[in-house]
């Protein structure tokens, strides 16, 4: 399998180095779809109340465990969707993503939404990985 990052010269550069405009995979044999991950511990407790960075770090650790279960890593992620309750948390989210997605980052969409499944949750992410 080969991975090619797509950032054409005539397309605006990504605002942050934690995503690419596109990702092309060839010869991928398996796709892994990671459901929306949130900042919850294994007992269902919200982690990092009122702290978007802490929540992003926890949900990315949860995502890492799901990817590992499939035999994948963050290097295999081709698409990431981010759902934020407050766009003022944009910088905190990208700071957390930078721990996982600086080398050949995935394509990504980030949107603000009115609420998540629990009132203390500030961010949710889902992903697609290719193996």
Regions found by a protein language model. Give the residues of each.
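N-terminal presequence-like segments and the immediate start of the first folded domain
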Residues: 1-61, 65-78, 84-131
């Amino acid at each position: 399998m080969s991975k090619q990052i797509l950032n054409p010269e005539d397309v605006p550069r990504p605002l942050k180095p934690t995503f690419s405009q596109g990702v092309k995979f060839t010869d991928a044999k398996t796709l892994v779809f990671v459901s929306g991950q949130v900042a919850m511990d294994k007992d269902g407790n919200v982690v990092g109340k009122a702290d978007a960075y802490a929540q992003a770090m926890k949900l990315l650790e949860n995502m890492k465990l799901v990817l590992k279960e499939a035999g994948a890593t963050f290097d295999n992620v081709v698409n990431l969707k981010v759902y934020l309750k407050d766009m003022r948390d944009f910088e905190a989210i990208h700071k957390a993503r930078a721990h996982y997605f600086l080398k050949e980052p995935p394509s990504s969409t980030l949107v603000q939404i009115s609420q998540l499944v629990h009132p203390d949750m500030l961010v949710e992410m889902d992903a697609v990985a290719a193996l």
